[in-house]
Amino acid sequence: MAFLVLLLAQLLSAPPPPHIKMTASASAPEVQAGTTIRLFVDVTPDPKVHVYAPGAKDYLPIALAIMPRAGIKVGKLTYPKSQDWYFEPLKEHVPVFTTAFRLDQAITLGAPLKAGDRVTVAGVLNYQACDDAVCFNPVAAPVNWSVTVK
């Protein structure tokens, strides 16, 4: 229990992630047990910065990992359409995100969760941001959502 409290304290006090702006939201603040809801992460790369999209070979594409927890079944993560970016020095095309986009994660809340439970869903947004000259160190940014079971 102490570990969980410490983890939540770190998540809630984490500094903003570098090179992007990130906002977490849910499709509903309350959900019936057994119902699937959507968890969103809205990401806006800084000007002149891109993050790699799924399908980028030899690069670290953006990904969302939901921490395991009893009563939470993690569904599919949906990505928007990426942009094709041509990297001149290597003469290659790479899928990236350069403008605001939304990640859409499905989850289902079930047993042992019950009506009245307030659930914090914790996750980590993994990404690597780059500009035209340099790729920055990979980042694992904590993200969380609060949902009440009704």
What do these predicted regions represent?
Residues M1-Q10:
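Sec-dependent N-terminal signal peptides
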Residues Q10-K150:
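Extracellular/lumen-exposed scaffold segments
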